[in-house]
């Protein structure tokens, strides 16, 4: 990890961004960090607006609230969350990002993305999951999956299954186009993500792109409602911490329904698998896990549940965002089709990869990468003590006018192919960084590349309806019309 930070840091001076303070300037105190005006107990006025007006319209614009704070206060902003919650420091400077991540250590600490899910699982006597754990227990579970999930050569083992799902997706899109004249990718992308999870995690087809699409839609809708309610409870008054509120009871009901379905899938898969004394390097994921001697069945289910719910929530929106960018930029789609036609068997697909990378930049799936500092730091010339929650606001960084000076709000995949245009290495972090980088990153990239190549190679794609933007529902999800037209080439 430290070597990767050094490698990235070598390019920092080439990038058009100046440091925010001189090393000779004495640091200012934590209390001097700018931010919205505080009210005792309540906290910051800006944040309190979300606590009082915790309706859907207000919550959906939380990402805009973060952008407005950056424009008003600058590269570092402090918010008092109020009602017994601690401060959070928002940073928008890649130099500060580098400082925070370089101090990660072996086990970086984070603020759980979904406190409600953490509370639910602990209440049920379950492990909170990879995304909600910190310390030695997180490190133990994460280390167990590192080989199978983060090494490119290991992920290649799953390519045949990704290809099966991409072929099913092409057939499903053709069926939807024929039946309805247009394709609702909000539904189809979710089914695709669920089917991919079945092949990778449960080692079987779930029928999500076939005769079980209605069952798949129900599970996807449950997951969506959990994320929507989680966002409302995260930004609202945290009364559920003390009392069983109507929102909390609704959350428990949703989680119960979701977990019962996924638990059945996990048990069905694990009951059919056997411990094998042979080399585990070529095993599929669940088989690999049960053959890890340091993992018991409970550990395996925790990992599978984390991977399943995280993948369902992130990969499907990214397929929609990629299709939208290609459908609204036909010249890019034609370039991909040319690339595929010239070498159908190639897996390089350089331009398609650049388009996917640009889509991650334009449509980041999250508002931030979080950390809890484990040592005292100096950020933008201010003292930030150990134990402070710090949000690296990737949503702002990846569309920054200085960091991406060449039309940051426009879709320009060529920017990733032009070596002359250096990008600050800590400005682009769609999967996080270091030991807590998204565990499913390489699976997601492989699934997107394989399925987009199949769709682009078979169809001319057009978007129909209002433009797609983003709303905040714990993650940044599509807002607008996700209807597409697929014409056979």
Swiss-Prot record:
CDD domains documented for this protein: CYP24A1-like
Region (Disordered): 12-31
Binding annotation for heme: 438
GTP-binding among keywords: no
UniProt keywords, alphabetically: Heme, Iron, Metal-binding, Monooxygenase, Oxidoreductase
InterPro entries attached to this UniProt entry: CYP11_CYP27_families (IPR050479), Cyt_P450 (IPR001128), Cyt_P450_CS (IPR017972), Cyt_P450_E_grp-I (IPR002401), Cyt_P450_sf (IPR036396)
UniProt feature, compositional bias: Low complexity: 16-29
Pfam families: p450
The keyword Oxidoreductase appears for this protein: yes
GO molecular function: heme binding; iron ion binding; monooxygenase activity; oxidoreductase activity, acting on paired donors, with incorporation or reduction of molecular oxygen
Domain of life (superkingdom): Eukaryota
Its EC number(s): 1.14.-.-
Cofactor(s) needed: heme
Family designation: Belongs to the cytochrome P450 family.
Function: Cytochromes P450 are a group of heme-thiolate monooxygenases. They oxidize a variety of structurally unrelated compounds, including steroids, fatty acids, and xenobiotics.
Annotated protein name in UniProt: Probable cytochrome P450 CYP44
Native species: Caenorhabditis elegans
Lineage of origin: Eukaryota, Metazoa, Ecdysozoa, Nematoda, Chromadorea
């Amino acid at each position: 990890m430290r070597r990767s930070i050094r490698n990235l840091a070598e390019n920092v001076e080439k990038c058009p961004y100046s440091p925010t303070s001189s090393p000779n300037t004495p640091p200012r105190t934590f209390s001097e960090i700018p931010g919205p005006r505080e009210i005792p107990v309540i906290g910051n006025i800006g944040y309190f607006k979300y606590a009082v007006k915790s309706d859907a319209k207000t919550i959906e614009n939380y990402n805009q609230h973060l952008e407005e704070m950056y424009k008003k206060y600058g590269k570092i902003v402090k918010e008092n969350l109020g009602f017994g919650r601690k401060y959070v420091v928002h940073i928008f400077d890649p130099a500060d990002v580098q400082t925070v991540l370089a101090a990660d250590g072996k086990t970086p600490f984070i603020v759980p993305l979904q406190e409600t899910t953490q509370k639910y699982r602990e209440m049920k006597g379950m492990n909170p999951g990879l995304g909600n754990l910190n310390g030695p227990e997180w490190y133990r579970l994460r280390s167990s999956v590192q080989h199978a999930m983060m090494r490119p050569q290991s992920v290649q083992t799953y390519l045949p299954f990704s290809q099966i799902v991409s072929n099913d997706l092409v057939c499903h899109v053709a069926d939807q186009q024929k039946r309805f004249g247009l394709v609702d990718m909000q539904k189809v992308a979710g089914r695709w993500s669920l089917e991919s999870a079945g092949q990778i995690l449960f080692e079987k087809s779930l029928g999500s792109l076939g005769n079980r699409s209605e069952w798949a839609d129900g599970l996807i809708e449950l997951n969506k409602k959990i994320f929507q309610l989680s966002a409302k409870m995260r930004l609202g008054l945290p009364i559920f911490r003390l009392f069983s509120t109507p929102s909390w009871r609704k959350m428990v009901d949703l989680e119960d329904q979701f977990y019962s379905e996924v638990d059945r899938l996990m048990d069905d898969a694990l009951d059919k698998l056997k411990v094998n004394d042979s080399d585990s390097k070529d095993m599929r994921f669940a088989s690999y896990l049960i053959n890890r001697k340091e993992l018991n069945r409970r550990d395996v289910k925790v990992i599978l549940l984390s991977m399943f719910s995280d993948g369902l929530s992130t990969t499907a929106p990214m397929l929609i965002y990629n299709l939208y960018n290609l459908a609204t930029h036909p010249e890019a789609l034609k370039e991909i089709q040319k690339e595929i036609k010239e070498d159908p068997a190639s897996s390089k697909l350089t331009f398609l990869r650049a388009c996917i990378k640009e889509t991650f930049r334009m449509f980041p799936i999250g508002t931030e990468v979080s950390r809890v500092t484990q040592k005292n730091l100096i950020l933008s010339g201010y003292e930030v003590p150990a134990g402070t929650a710090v949000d690296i606001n990737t949503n702002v960084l990846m569309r920054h006018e200085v960091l991406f000076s060449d039309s940051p709000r426009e879709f320009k995949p060529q920017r990733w192919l032009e070596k002359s245009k250096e990008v600050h290495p800590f400005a682009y972090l769609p999967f996080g960084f270091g030991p807590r980088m998204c565990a499913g990153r390489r699976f997601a990239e492989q699934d997107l590349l394989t399925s987009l190549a199949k769709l682009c190679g078979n169809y001319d794609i057009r978007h129909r309806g209002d433009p797609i933007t983003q709303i905040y529902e714990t993650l940044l999800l599509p807002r607008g019309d996700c209807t597409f037209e697929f014409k056979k080439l």
